[in-house]
Amino acid sequence: AGAASTHLALIVIAADDGIMPQTLEHLEILTSLGITKGIVALSKIDLVKDLEWIELVEMDIRELLIENKFELISFNKVDSLSGKGIQSLKNNLMNIRPVEFLANYSSNFRINVDRVFSKIGFGTVLTGTVNNGRIEVGENIEISPTKEKAKIRGIQSHGKAVKHINAGDRVALNLKNVKTSDIKRGTVISTPNLLKSSSLIIIYLKMNKNTSWKIKNKQRLRFYFGTLEVLGRVTLCDRMALDAGERENVIVQLETDICVALDDKFIIRTYSPMKTIAGGVILEINPEGTLKELRKTISSIPLIIEDRFYFFVNRDRIKPKNSHVWEKIFLNSSALIEGWKTKFKLISSNSILYTKRSEEESIKEMSLFLDDSYKKNPFRKILNDDIIITSLGWSEIWLDTIKKKLIQENIIKIEDGGFLKVGATLNFSKKDLELLNRLESIIEKSELDQISIKKIPGILNIKQSRTNDL
């Protein structure tokens, strides 16, 4: 727990031992967390007198990294006692440009707490590595999952007091009016109202290729999100177990609420004995629908984040969101969201974001609904917004967007506080005409006497709603 907040790996392998089982496990953890670049330090070279052995170990390591698609930045042979190769290793570390790993990060602040303590004269202090965004002394933050609010009293980074911090920084935060008991390892500190708590998530699960374990349906497992360990169970979609190297979108029901973001990566271990057996990516948080419904649909959720963005925008068309909301959901930079909008040719109108396909499908859906409404009830030619919202489940802003498009295309027109389809005619059946004639006759015969509308259903032998339409 905690490795998820890193971007590069320093893989240290002893020259006298070579590749060990833990080396393979650590490499699988790194690749599962999306850490695919790093530096190798071959240590204890002073203990190996046979230079050919060192060359063989180096060859094995390079082949292992290639096999796991791990990009090697530099290979360093070091001896800690004499200091040989240490300065070269330091130089290689310092030459890495962090900007390439942080360019697409959201401006919203988020950090996973890995340690918390109290310091005399200061109060509660927490430490961690900044996942996203930037924050300054004096700004307000939110503690999740409790959703308590607090203010940053002071910030330190690498032992020095600083005014602000950015994504990737290793920091200590001093919080005002917060008890150490309110925070623990795994707690998330973020921009207020950024994250939602949930115990139900959809994940892309990938089994380690070297594991001898299986993951069975409803199996209890250990999940490591950021610095948090939490227990939960997986629900598989169309099989009873996953074997080594297999992958699938699955449902996870956790035993406690967590605060995570889309595309967060994590590790899975067995409950007992504790063995690392899989990794994954969070595809969706707090999905709507029953488990039975989700099992039928989650396999279509894409793994690639930009494709998933398009999928969600299209899927959620009847309740669309704006760019700012999508930026918070995906915790990515506004520039990246704008790039996706351009790539997928999304429409930004009426303060919402949607696809051309969504627009076309909704126009067709509304047109069919109007035709069906006239067929079921030829007396009601003019419809109001509430009928559409209730019947189709659309949001008000989406109905307004589609109505404007239909008016532009002369498919509907506004009339008497509602709207109707252009060219719609009232096609009365023989029974409809008979009822109208009978009602007209009743009204004419009453002359100046009032008739209670509640009595008409009994006279005509029809329902009250039908009477209102007549």
Where do the model's predicted regions map?
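Conserved catalytic-core segments of large NTP-driven translation/proteostasis enzymes
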Residues: 55, 63-211
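Conserved Switch II/interswitch segment of TRAFAC-class P-loop GTPases
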Residues: 3-26, 31-55
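Residue-level signature of catalytic and energy-coupling elements of molecular machines
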Residues: 10, 30, 43, 61, ...
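G-domain G4 guanine-recognition motif of GTPases
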Residues: 14-15, 39-55, 75-84, 176, ...
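Beta-strand/loop-dominated core regions that host nucleotide or nucleotide-derived cofactor-binding catalytic loops
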Residues: 140-307, 400, 421-422, 429
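Conserved nucleotide-binding/hydrolysis micro-motifs of P-loop NTPases
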Residues: 15-20, 35, 44-49, 80-84, ...
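Short, intrinsically disordered, charge-balanced linker/junction segments flanking boundaries
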Residues: 1, 257, 467-470
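C-terminal non-catalytic scaffold/interaction domains in large multidomain proteins
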Residues: 286-470
